[in-house]
């Protein structure tokens, strides 16, 4: 009998403290729906579902015809299943990690190094930078999803410096004056002034940060209790972040970074060196296979301030420019493609109406991982005359050049995300 190259996966859950708790978490719900034997603990966070072959979360293969236990082991012995170009380009490894995230409290403000810097940092400090790879990533919202991403337009930051004296006192008069002046001097001057402002903020004394933050929290709380809106200085968000990370420098970053709320299906792409933080909501995320993170705030972990201030991309841009729009397929009315400007990964969104009885998954010269978010199907695999039932939360590995047909077993709409590598 032919060696199966399409099979279901049991994926690793990460229970980080910032995750949504119990059945409020989309990660937990996907898990429970795909495996009725799963017991969800209503007092534990379910933060991330890892779908891939990363050593810290290698998916288990759910097919007793296959001797290898995990996807990583199987790919190592079946490298042709990656597709010829993917195999050659990425040294016989799956180049992406596919995830679902359920965020309750803010993740740290962070940026990921480009390949050149990642190699240097890994050599210098492997305990903080565990590999030499870059880590571009893309988040696609499943529910309304809030995050910080990239530096705001300079005029917005200047407005906050006027309205939030506590913020201005940390940035300092000279850096504030330089930023205002840069508005008439072009993009290079603005980036340089932003770097100066951010560096001043990050290098502020802890004692001074705590004092100014306490003053600001008190002022906002009083105004809100008097019935006044503080939306013009993101008052509610500041209180929320301060409650989660009291006295943390990252609370002030909301005045420097764009606040973005993605609607379901909207995406943001996070290139190397762009500062960002996920604040709340559920998303599908795809990234290059790396663990390198340079943190800036909203974290009790190690902060490498000098590396961070040097590496960041200080290009200001409005929040709408941070949205990453998919392209609609010319040949398939149900297919949208999120194809970022990096070779490591592409994500496809498939939305099939319940009135359709069968859907042919696009055959690719790339290994792919398919996640069923909504619906119930039977996957038909002609190469081995096999059938695999999949319900909500089901995850399927599809080897390169394999044909898969999905039969809708219940007449309900399908929502599927599929990660692959289009070289």
UniProtKB/Swiss-Prot annotation:
Subcellular location: Cytoplasm
Binding-site positions, Zn(2+): 110, 112, 137, 276
The record's free-text note on cofactor binding: Binds 1 zinc ion per subunit.
Enzyme class: isomerase
Pfam families from the UniProt entry: PMI_typeI_C (PF01238), PMI_typeI_cat (PF20511), PMI_typeI_hel (PF20512)
GO cellular component: cytosol
Catalysed reaction equations from the record: D-mannose 6-phosphate = D-fructose 6-phosphate
Pathways involved: Nucleotide-sugar biosynthesis; GDP-alpha-D-mannose biosynthesis; alpha-D-mannose 1-phosphate from D-fructose 6-phosphate: step 1/2
SUPFAM superfamilies: RmlC-like cupins
EC code(s) of this entry: 5.3.1.8
MF (Gene Ontology): mannose-6-phosphate isomerase activity; zinc ion binding
Family: Belongs to the mannose-6-phosphate isomerase type 1 family.
Record PANTHER family: MANNOSE-6-PHOSPHATE ISOMERASE
Protein name: Mannose-6-phosphate isomerase
Lineage: Eukaryota, Metazoa, Chordata, Craniata, Vertebrata
